């Protein structure tokens, strides 16, 4: 997704393409927010018989903006579901704006689940960390959950794993 203007949010990343013969395409990254804008959401990974596509990362927030959410990983049938995208970091001076949540991992009924994306970090001083993404449902093994993002130095909670 494209970067936002001064007060605008970043654009949403495009979805990864699906395939019935291989691995799904990766989702596009979300654009970075303008000075007061939030980061855009990452696009979801595409469906693939032999592996789900990875979700796109969320864009970073502008100086005062929140981070964008990571895209979810694509679903797979035979192999592993796609990993969720990482959440974008919040802007340095964002008051109460959190890092973006990590995307959830893709599922696979005959393979392993994809890992959840890590949460974005809160603003350098004041923001809370974003939550880590949920691991995907799998037949062989479930996907690992993503780690939560770090909080700002002065105020803010760490993100949940």
Language-model regions, residue ranges each:
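Long, compositionally biased tandem-repeat segments
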Residues: 1-161
């Amino acid at each position: 997704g494209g970067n936002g203007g001064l007060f605008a949010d970043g654009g949403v990343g495009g979805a990864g393409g699906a395939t019935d013969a291989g691995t799904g395409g990766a989702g596009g990254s979300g654009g970075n927010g303008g000075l007061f804008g939030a980061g855009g959401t990452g696009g979801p990974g595409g469906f693939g018989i032999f592996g789900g596509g990875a979700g796109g990362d969320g864009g970073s927030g502008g100086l005062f903006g929140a981070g964008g959410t990571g895209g979810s990983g694509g679903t797979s049938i035979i192999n592993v579901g796609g990993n969720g995208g990482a959440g974008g970091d919040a802007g340095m001076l964002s008051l109460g704006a959190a890092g973006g949540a990590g995307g959830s991992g893709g599922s696979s009924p005959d393979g392993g689940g994809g890992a959840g994306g890590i949460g974005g970090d809160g603003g350098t001083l004041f923001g809370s960390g974003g939550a880590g993404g949920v691991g995907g449902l799998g037949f062989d093994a479930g996907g690992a959950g993503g780690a939560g993002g770090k909080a700002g130095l002065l105020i803010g909670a760490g993100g949940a794993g």
